[in-house]
């Protein structure tokens, strides 16, 4: 079976990715961002396609990779968490775990079919948290969506209407 132009078919290793931000986010200092599937801090997974004589393939976007992203937090000020698609149109879901409670967010909130089309400035507010405990984000890059994406952490004093 010939490979299509996307060249995504293959067998990959590293389908479960544990990312831990090495420095705690401090809400007293200012805003921060965690970027996912950018092929810099978070490299694309590499595999091979057995149907084309073990041709090397790269999953540009890490589609199908399950992420657990742990963000330690500290500071004195509550902070807002935003989802920011940077690579184009995006639609999917993320689960955020904080202080023993879990919440699932649809991105976008399903009032629109997708967000981020033609702009890297679209954001969706997810929730507000108090610092001092780790924030854990579970997600899998949605197929047919565009990456990379960012999670923005912004002190509430810098965000109007939160």
Label every PLM stretch briefly.
Residues 1-32, 36:
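Activation corresponds to long, low-complexity, non-globular regions
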Residues 23-162:
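Long compositionally biased, domain-poor regions of proteins
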């Amino acid at each position: 079976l010939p490979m299509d132009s996307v060249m995504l078919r293959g067998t990959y290793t590293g389908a479960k990715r544990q990312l831990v931000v090495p420095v705690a986010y401090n809400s007293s200092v200012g805003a921060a961002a965690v970027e996912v599937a950018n092929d810099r801090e978070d490299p694309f997974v590499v595999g091979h396609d057995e149907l084309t004589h073990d041709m090397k393939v790269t999953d540009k976007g890490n589609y199908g990779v399950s992420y657990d992203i742990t963000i330690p937090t500290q500071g004195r000020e509550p902070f807002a968490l935003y989802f920011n698609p940077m690579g184009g149109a995006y639609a999917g879901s993320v689960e955020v775990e904080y202080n023993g409670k879990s919440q699932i967010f649809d991105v976008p909130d399903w009032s629109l079919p997708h967000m981020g089309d033609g702009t890297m400035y679209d954001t969706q507010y997810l929730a507000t948290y108090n610092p001092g405990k780790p924030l854990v984000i579970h997600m899998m890059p949605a197929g047919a969506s565009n990456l990379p994406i960012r999670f923005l952490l912004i002190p509430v004093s810098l965000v109007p209407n939160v």
